[in-house]
Every structure is written in structure tokens, then in C-alpha cells.
Amino acid sequence: MKNTQTNGTHPIIDKKPNGTLNGDHQEYPTFSQEKLDDSIKRGIDLQVFRYPSTGINVLIAGAGLGGITCALECWRKGHNVRIIDRSPSPVWTGDNVQIQPSAILLLRHWPDMGYEIEENQYDVDMSYYRQTGERIWGPAPPMFNDPEHLPGRRGFPSVNAHSRIKLYRAFLKQAERVGIYVEWGCKVVEYWEDVEGHAGGVVLENGEKRTADIVVAADGLRTKSMTIVPGMPDQLTTSGKAIYRAGYPVEHALKDPTVREMWNFKPEDKPIWQFWLGNGSHNMMCLTHDLAFWSFIHSHAESASESWIPDIDPAEVITEMEKNDAVHPAIAALIRTAPKGSVVNWQLKFRDPHEQWTSPGGHVVQLGDAAHAFLPTSGNGATQAIEDGVTLATCLQLAGKAQAANATKVYNKLRFQRVSCGQKMGFVNQQLKQHTDWDAIMKNPALIRSRYPKWVWSHDPEAYAYEKFAEALTHVVSGGRVPLVNTNFPKGHKYRHWTMKEVQEQIKAGQKLEDLQDGDWS
């Protein structure tokens, strides 16, 4: 990848690739004793080490977190990478994003990016309240940071909460450090593959064609790859829910006397993260040293859109909240502090799990939301997209150019069951907060905590791909005659296909989703 700009790129930094060890050119920088000690103590690479070239050409369509992760890891694993995106420039909107430890592991190989993200993340404890103001539980860290889970953990810390804008900027900057520049304004209208020619490709809106050994569809829920992936549901299904969400400078919130009185928050204090639960809905609020975030998940309304255009009046949010339950005055006050142009109302749509993420020949492969939709209550969508990128790049490295098309199928087999179980956890958390069993919670308030299962956060996607690749490849090339036994989802669980409609009917019938699952989902 040449370190040059092309039409449509919008560089975040203006630097040449940093000193990397890539088999061709080696630089040996000096490091401070402090950095050397930290590298040894926490298991963080001193610099980015690039593996020898595989000769595999990878084209990634979609420069979200999953797509950028895939680009970075494909570069690190020795592949040739290009990345395009339909947006005319980077999208600097969004509020907060949750990243679990299994995805944070990636940063140990990208130290500059890791230190930047570590500096900007929000170390939050979580509390849970009723809309009356009654505290249920907390403050306490997310489950994966309970004291008993911390010994032996290495790499950068995972504290769960990040500014989406800061996190995304760090990923883009790291890509540019190694010479990967996103080509913006490239809208894909069609995917194709030529099995005999061992290639996949895309057609852009302007009629231009791009081709590569492997094409990664990382272009979101409405991916155009659905026409080339067998068995993929054509339509997205509404979940019946939508989410108001906002993020803006914290000084707007702290100007309000009711907000100041309720939370007594100062920018130098530890961030506050609270869930407020009502009748069939819930909202989240967070105050940090520089930003305020809040969200409210509610029953689907016609005003909800599929656009991130922040054009919602905060008064609309309060009106919608009052349909379910009385709104605490402090929550209403906080919502009113959102400045114009900061609030979105986003439909929560879902696509039932589909087992195949590749084109028939394997030259086109889906990643992130294009392969699997997550509800925000899972706190897991971005994490799984990052895991996807790590896994796919590793499978391509192990397969080599001759088996690259089979590598995408291996990636698919390693990921599907895990991701499908993760998707179901979004409904578990939704039921917990919107169909709360208050009798059980009053007996044991800790049961209200958001579920962050150990089988999710303790996973190492790179190590798992190295461990399972040969077994999975044999499974693929044998046409499934040789079994593959995945171990990256709940222990003891026997996977079976499920649908959103089935889960919603179970919730409506008053059945607890957690109690219906076999195996250990904790």
C-alpha cells in the first residue's frame, strides 16, 4: 500500500508509515525505560510488527469499526489492503460505544493506538435506578471488571465506555500511520465473484469496477452483498423498538441547576453511568469530564428513522418517555440540556441469524452488521465486529493465497454460533430492563446488572483462530463430513436456529429468556 493520497481520501494525520518490522524494511527505534517496563508488565508490543507478505489482495467495503479493524489486521498479517466507504468523508457523529475485553486485546499489537484509546476511555461504574429515583444497585463495574476477573489479564485495560468519535478517530489515525487511506465517496451498488478467475469484486455507483482476491462486505445492515450470499433474508425486520440517543459537551448539562443538584458532578470526578428503568422502557445517562451521553429505548414510533441525522427536539423524547411512566425531574432536566443538532431517533432493526456469510465461491465475505445485527442492549455489537476483523485476517494468513477463498468459509464457521448466541444476549438484557421481574430484583438487587457473560469477554479471537483453523478448514473442504466443534460460545449449549419472532413471543408469554437456555451462559 503506497503512502499516498488518492481522490476521495480525507487524511486524519499527515505522517509516513511508522517504523514497522515487515520483512523488507526495518527500523530499530529506541524506547524509554518506562515504555519497556510497561511492555513487559502488560504484554503490549513495543511497536507494530508486520508478518511476511501473503500476496492476498483484500478489498474492504465499509470503513466502520469492523472494516477498519479488518484493514489494520489484514495489513499486519501481510495482506495487501484497500478500503472504500460510501460516505463522502468520515462521519463524526455518535455518542458512546461499549467495547469488551475480547476486542480490547487487539490493541496490544497496536501500541500507539492503544495508548491513545486508553487515555480517552471512560472508566465507569454502573448504577441502576427506578424512575421514582429509588436506587436498585450500584455503583459497580461492568461484570467483566469484577475483582475476581482481573488477575492475569494483560494488555490494555477494558473499562467499557468510549466516545464513538474519539475511538473512531484513533482507528483511522492508526490506519494512516501504516499507509492505509480510506477512499471516501465510493458507494457500492453490486457485489460479484468470478470463481474460475479466483476473484471477487464490486460495482460502484459511478459504474467503476473494483476487484480483489477477497472482498469484505463491511457496509452495514443494508449491505448490497445480500444478493450474492445464499440464504440471507432479504428484509430487515423491525424489533418494535427505537432509540433516542445524544452526546454533547458536558458543560451544557452542568449549566442546569437540577442536573447539578441531582448528580453533584464535577469534570474531575469519576464518570457517572446510570440506567433508569420504567414500565416497558429504560434510559441510560452518563456524565464524563468532557461529554454527556444519554439514550432512551422506546416502542417503535413512526418518527424513528434509519438515519443518524441529529434533528430531534429533546421535548419529543420527554413526551415519549411519559407514555410509559412518570419521568424523574432530573432525567427530564438532563434531556432538555441537549443542544440543537445532537439528538437522533434510530429504528432498531434486526435480521434473523443466517448461517452463511460468504458467496458460493468464498471470494465475497460479510463482516460486522452486514453479517449479524445486534441490539444496543447487548453492549456487544462493536466488540463482535472487531472480533470478526481479527478472525478473518488471521484465517487468510493461515490459508495463504491459494486457499484464501476457503479461509473466508473457515472464518464464517468459527464465528457464526458465537455471534448468534451474542445476538440473543441483546434480548436477554432488553427483557431485564424493560420487562423487569421486580419481585426477583427486590429479593436480590444484583440480578438487575447488565449481563456481560464470561464466554464473551474472556475470548481471544486471534488465539482461537490459530487454534481452530486446521480443524475448521478440514470441516470446510470435506463438505462438513468432518465435524467442527466450536468452544467459543456457552459451554454445554447445543446450538439451534432461532428467530426474533420466537424470542419476542417468549418474552410476551412471560418466559425468562435466561431460564430457557441450556448450558452455562454466565
Curated annotation (Swiss-Prot):
Name of the top EC class for this enzyme: oxidoreductase
Disruption phenotype: Leads to an alteration in the product spectrum, with an accumulation of fusarubinaldehyde.
GO molecular function, one term: FAD binding
Annotated positions binding FAD: 164, 369, 382
Enzyme Commission numbers on file: 1.-.-.-
InterPro entries: FAD-bd, FAD-dep_Monooxygenase_BioMet, FAD/NAD-bd_sf
Disordered, as annotated region: 1-27
Active-site residue list: 245
Keywords, comma-separated and alphabetical: FAD, Flavoprotein, Monooxygenase, Oxidoreductase
UniProt pathway: Polyketide biosynthesis
Induction trigger: Expression is repressed under acidic conditions, while the expression is induced under alkaline conditions. Expression is induced in presence of sodium nitrate, and repressed by glutamine.
Cofactor: FAD
Main function: FAD-dependent monooxygenase; part of the gene cluster that mediates the biosynthesis of fusarubins, highly pigmented naphthoquinones responsible for the coloration of the fruiting bodies. The non-reducing polyketide synthase FSR1 is responsible for the condensation of seven acetyl-CoA units to yield a haptaketide. After rings A and B are formed by aldol-type cyclization, the PKS-derived product is released as 6-O-demethylfusarubinaldehyde.
Protein family per UniProt: Belongs to the paxM FAD-dependent monooxygenase family.
Name by which UniProt lists this protein: FAD-dependent monooxygenase fsr3
Source organism of this protein record: Gibberella fujikuroi (strain CBS 195.34 / IMI 58289 / NRRL A-6831) (Bakanae and foot rot disease fungus)
Originating gene: fsr3
